Design a protein with these regions (language model features):
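N-terminal alpha/beta PP-like core and its mobile active-site loop of ThDP/TPP-dependent enzymes
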Residues: 1-167
Length: 167
């Protein structure tokens, strides 16, 4: 999923089983977080009634990955799936890209619902910055235009965002 996202610029997706399947994704999720790679990771989970009861292969993947994801969801109602999936992909690719975990209990996966995506994503408090601060850009320009031997060290985000030529 990480390689796909890096190669295409699109959101990478993976689906893993509960327990060890979920925990084996942690290094990849952390790498994607540090490198700003957009991922949506779907993890299996024990049925909702067994969460918190130390069930076989129950893992708190939300808690484990909290420090290295943009957001995590534990879907407890199948009716929430369209909204959660739409939000997960939106969050993974907007602002600074990064991984989002969607934890899916077995009973939720087995349930059925009418699947209609919401037309738009409405997340309270989430306002990704999409434009540079004009004052900072002007200051950088002034410093670079006066420099005798300027050096710019730019991260991979320049390539990912397609701004190489502009830089």
């Amino acid at each position: 999923a990480d390689g796909y996202a890096r190669a295409t610029g699109r959101v990478g997706v993976c689906l893993v089983t509960s327990g060890p399947g979920a925990t084996n994704t942690v290094t990849g999720i952390a790498t994607a977080y540090l490198d700003s790679v957009p991922l949506v990771v779907f993890t299996g989970q024990v049925p909702t009634a067994l969460i918190g009861n130390d069930a076989f292969q129950e893992v708190d993947i939300i808690g484990i990955t909290r420090p290295c994801t943009k957001h995590s969801y534990l879907v407890k109602d199948v009716a929430d799936m369209p909204r959660v999936i739409k939000e997960a992909f939106y969050l993974a690719r907007t602002g600074r890209p990064g991984p989002v975990v969607v934890d899916l209990p077995k009973d939720v996966i087995q349930a059925t619902t009418e699947f209609r995506y919401p037309k738009k994503v409405e997340l309270k408090g989430y306002r990704p910055t999409t434009e540079a601060h004009l004052g900072q850009v002007q200051r950088a320009y002034q410093l670079l235009s006066r420099a005798k031997r300027p050096v710019i060290i730019a991260g991979g985000g320049v390539v990912t965002s397609g701004a190489s030529e502009e830089l």
